[in-house]
Amino acid sequence: MSDRIREKLQILADAAKYDVSCSSSGSDRKNKNKGLGDASHSGICHSYTEDGRCVSLLKILFSNVCIFDCAYCVSRRSNDVQRAAFTVQEVVDLTINFYRRNYIEGLFLSSGIFKSADHTMERMLQVVKKLRLEENFNGYIHLKTIPGASPELIHEAGLYADRMSINLEMPTEIGLKTFAPEKSHQEVQKDLGLIRDRLIQLKDERQIIKHVPKYVPAGQTTQMVVGAHQESDQDVLFMADKHYKEFKLKRVYFSGYIPINTENNYLPAVGSAPPLLRENRLYQSDWLMRFYGFEVNEIVNEKHPNLDLDVDPKLSWALRHPEQFPVDLNRADYQMILRVPGIGVKSAKKIVQARRFGKIHIDLLKKLGVAYQRAKFFIRCEDSPKFQKELSSSFIRQQILTQGSSKYVQQLSPQLSLGF
């Protein structure tokens, strides 16, 4: 690798680290014709930076030159940083060479917008086409959609990328206009809708046509920056819920704002800590909506617009709804068992299965992986005491926080947990 390429790589890999939407699950692209890589069988090897962010792929910008001046972005037009740009062939060569050395399993490619949205999207499209068609590369490719690019370019990119994503940037339109007046949620939603509609069309065609081309097989995602503006957690989660339902997104990512701008007084001061604990609570809430059957207004609402940072959102909901407990594990349905703090998806399924063979006892719960010290305040089993003193929510909260104090300290470093 030449010194110039090494310098470009250092600049453009560092500039890409603020984009967290690089999860790679969900693709079933198989190796064909003795090509390179296999997103289906080999999987993606994830690694984490010191602040807990996933950097599993060759994660780079095509260029950090940008015509926009978004206040929260390190690559903004007015920022005095070293600029660089790859050529199409340089990105292709880097990807293939790194893959052959077993450094990576795929490519995450984004870019600043240089000249125009179409010009930038064309260059990125050339990269993925060369990898697929000329290099016969079958590894994982995550391609960022450039906002405002023509529908034809976006549709063609979907034929070669495993996953595509486009960032909402801010949870509220007010926040976006404050820090990025040249952008709008409407434009992002238009591009998300293009891919959604194409996926629906191809799904319908598969009913009558045997061979339909793969199109963004791992779906599309988006990302929001949290903590830059005065948005509430209700703003963030309602926006996420809206996009899950309207655009069939696979994931919504939350990125705690890392202060990098000394010139904008409306942004958090440089040197202040990014809101990692808040970011973690948002991910836990996202998990509840996607896997636990919670509606967004059960987690946050007008009365409770922000998440409790001291306890996870599932426990917070349980403490606010004592009328729902205790749950009789020998009679309750699966969805209600899922709502018990300390019981996850796997444990809930095991409990339902175990009931076919006998009553649920406390010892069995521990064997099934239930966090009993947390769950015990919210359940009844066959061998639970017949008469139990009714405990207040504040008492239960304090007991759980006291029991788990050392655990919560550990969660802050380096990778925050999603565990409930």
What is each PLM-predicted segment?
Residues M1-V65, A371, I379, F387-Q411, ...:
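Flexible, acidic/Gly-rich N-terminal and inter-domain linker regions that tether
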Residues L57, C70, L109, I166, ...:
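Conserved, mostly hydrophobic/aromatic
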Residues L58-I60, Q89-R100, Q207-I208:
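Short, charged beta->alpha transition segments
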Residues I60-Q89:
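Canonical Radical SAM [4Fe-4S] cluster-binding loop centered on the CxxxCxxC motif
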Residues V92, K115-I299:
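Conserved AdoMet/S-adenosylmethionine-binding subsite of the radical SAM
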Residues I96-G112, S285:
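Short Fe-S-cluster ligation motifs
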Residues N306-M336, I362-F420:
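C-terminal extensions
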